[in-house]
């Protein structure tokens, strides 16, 4: 993460992260074993997944006039997921010796190699505007536009939201009441489809 302040009212933050894992699995059943693979069975799976994410956003604030203040956030987000799987299944070994414990030790009709890859990318820009009006009224407006690699012809998908809140504590003068606020919100959200449906 890198942070930079242009001045007291404008700041930039950049965050980048990568998460990677690999999972290798091997299942071997020698010929003559007490299982369904009694003529020998070899199963190997190799899984890997890399998740990377970039976030950049500007935050700031200003006073529009003596009664209205504004705080804002403008940002960009990029997400990528790269999932891979390689698999091999073999049965009825050609050579039962364990020295030949690898793919290629079975006739083609008893060998089933397979591979799969899913690559997904997502890009989005967003903005949040928070208005403080007077001492009791708060208005928040947000918007987010996204593109998805799983929807290449959809263009930019936009999600708006808005909320308004009012502090009633000053209007209701009760010693037993320390804080009372009402809030109403509206928002739209969406989820991208999987890569293959």
Residue ranges: model-predicted function:
Residues 61-75:
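Outer-membrane beta-barrel channel domains
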Residues 156, 175-178:
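Short, glycine-/polar-rich solvent-exposed loops and beta-turns at beta-strand/coil boundaries
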Residues 20-22, 80-82, 147, 190-192:
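Feature marks short, surface-exposed loop/turn motifs that line or immediately flank catalytic pockets
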Residues 26-42, 84-113, 197:
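Surface-exposed loop/turn segments flanking beta-strands in extracellular/periplasmic regions
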Residues 12-14, 70-74, 139-141, 160, ...:
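Transmembrane beta-strands of outer-membrane beta-barrel proteins
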Residues 1-3, 7, 67-71, 192-197:
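Membrane-proximal, glycine/serine-rich, low-complexity loop/turn segments characteristic
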Residues 1-63, 120-151, 155-170, 180-197:
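Surface-exposed extracellular loop regions of Gram-negative outer-membrane beta-barrel proteins
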